[in-house]
């Protein structure tokens, strides 16, 4: 396949070229990796030390996961320049799980459900008629719509501000607005480097304004902690399990398996490799398998599920560098960043409105991606029915959770998430309506 690549998948770029390409990838993914743990920690009201450690371990786990994807071990890994990082898709179910059983239940449920994606990687061709693009589009749309609420809460000051009466003050909203407008401005700049780092620049400006307004509490920093190294400790917070959390998180693993398939396909195409035949199927299967395995590994090291980042496919196009060996540099950078507590500490002190201004836009793009997937399909009578019943029930539960207050605890815990309710409805409705026809 003819391409404009400077370095192909198996080429080994010189150190300088590889390092420069790796830095551009790092700019594109850094904020996306640390945002989920920051949002989850804020929602669960975790202290600075625990938040900092979770951020650091997200960077560490993302580095290890990226190395596995690029290197490939047996059937695990795509052997492409596939970058992995903490997934946004799991935030809603993880927060709901954390409210019930804390951090141990989060890690236990995420690890227990991770084999679902690994199994899907070996049986995906049999599930394609069940988890269709319409179904996956509906779930992605529901994920985005449910996360927008989380972003708005952060813009207002977070859950802590709701408790202490400082929610939605003019300072909080001004900080969030500055970040949002800055990200939009830099994203529309002609300079490609400003575009690539638009979120980082927006966060820096928001952080500066928050500091000037006295919103950054530096007293929470522990100097001794900052001077030390983060030693990854497997199962530091323990693990727990319940069925309802397993089902809610397991459903998202099904969707990330589909997303990973699309990401590996796009990466293969950009890298000038075939997107059909045995070699292609081996890459897709290995990529999805690694997605699940790496999410399990992330749980072991006190981090949240990982997924392949689609934005890095754009960086490959931009740089013309598809060499998987560049992934080794990226992996090393992420691991090193995760070992220094000061990185996690600086971002754990970030006020909620700063994060909210950036994540509001990110979550909106997740919802937009769901709309794009749905609209890529021909929407006939059957598809309209599936879409209508799934969104009605999914959004209904999300907007009015009290509708389940009289239901048994087992039912309430499973269907309290709009993503789970809407996703399961989409799968069942898609099967039933197709059978009826």
Which residue stretches match the model-derived regions?
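Intrinsically disordered, low-complexity non-transmembrane regions of multi-pass membrane transporters
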Residues: 1-21, 163-164, 218-235, 269-286, ...
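Membrane-embedded helical hairpins/re-entrant loop segments and their flanking transmembrane helices
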Residues: 15, 41-79, 251-324
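Membrane-embedded alpha-helical modules
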Residues: 97-217, 221, 329-437
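Generic transmembrane alpha-helix signature in multi-pass membrane proteins
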Residues: 37-41, 90-99, 125, 154-156, ...
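Juxtamembrane interface elements at the cytosolic ends of transmembrane helices
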Residues: 2-3, 33-37, 41, 178-189, ...
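Short, non-helical or kinked segments that cap or interrupt transmembrane helices
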Residues: 53-54, 75-88, 129-138, 195-200, ...
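N-terminal signal-anchor module of multipass membrane proteins
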Residues: 1-81, 89-99
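Hydrophobic, membrane-embedded alpha-helices of multi-pass small-molecule transporters
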Residues: 16-28, 168-180, 197-198, 213, ...
């Amino acid at each position: 396949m003819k391409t404009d690549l400077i370095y192909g998948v198996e080429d080994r770029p010189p150190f300088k070229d590889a390092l420069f390409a790796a830095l551009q990838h790092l700019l594109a993914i850094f904020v996306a990796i640390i945002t989920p743990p920051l949002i989850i920690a804020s929602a669960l009201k975790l202290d600075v030390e625990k938040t900092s450690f979770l951020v650091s371990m997200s960077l560490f786990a993302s580095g290890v996961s990226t190395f596995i994807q690029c290197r490939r071990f047996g059937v695990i890994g795509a052997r492409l320049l596939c970058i992995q990082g903490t997934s946004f898709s799991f935030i809603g179910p993880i927060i709901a799980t954390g409210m019930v059983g804390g951090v141990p239940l989060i890690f236990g449920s995420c690890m227990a459900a991770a084999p679902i994606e690994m199994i899907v990687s070996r049986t995906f061709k049999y599930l394609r008629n069940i988890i269709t693009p319409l179904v996956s589009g509906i779930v992605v749309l529901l994920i985005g719509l449910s996360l927008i609420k989380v972003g708005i809460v952060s813009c207002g000051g977070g859950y802590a501000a709701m408790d202490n009466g400082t929610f939605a003050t003019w300072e909080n909203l001004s900080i969030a607005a500055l970040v949002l407008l800055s990200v939009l401005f830099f994203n529309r700049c002609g300079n490609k480097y400003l575009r690539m780092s638009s979120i980082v620049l927006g966060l820096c400006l928001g952080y500066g304004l928050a500091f000037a307004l006295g919103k950054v509490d530096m007293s929470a920093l522990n100097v001794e902690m900052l001077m030390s190294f983060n030693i990854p400790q497997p199962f530091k917070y323990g693990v727990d399990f319940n069925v309802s959390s397993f089902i809610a998180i397991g459903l998202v693993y099904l969707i990330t398996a589909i997303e990973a398939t699309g990401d590996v396909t796009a990466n293969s195409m950009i890298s000038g490799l075939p997107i059909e035949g045995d070699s292609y199927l081996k890459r897709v299967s290995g990529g999805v398998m690694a997605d699940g395995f790496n999410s399990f590994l992330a749980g072991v090291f006190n981090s949240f599920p990982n997924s392949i980042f689609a934005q890095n496919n754009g960086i490959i196009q931009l740089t013309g560098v598809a060499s998987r060996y560049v992934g080794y540099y990226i992996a090393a950078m992420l691991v090193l960043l995760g070992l220094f507590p000061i990185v996690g500490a600086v971002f754990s002190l970030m006020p909620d409105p700063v994060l909210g201004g950036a994540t509001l836009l990110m979550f909106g793009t997740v919802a937009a991606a769901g709309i794009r997937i749905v609209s890529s399909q021909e929407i006939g009578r059957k598809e309209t029915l599936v879409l209508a019943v799934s969104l009605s029930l999914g959004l209904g539960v999300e907007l009015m959770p009290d509708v389940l207050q009289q239901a048994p605890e087992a039912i309430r815990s499973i269907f309290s998430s709009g993503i789970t309710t809407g996703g399961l409805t989409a799968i069942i409705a898609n099967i039933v309506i197709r059978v009826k026809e």
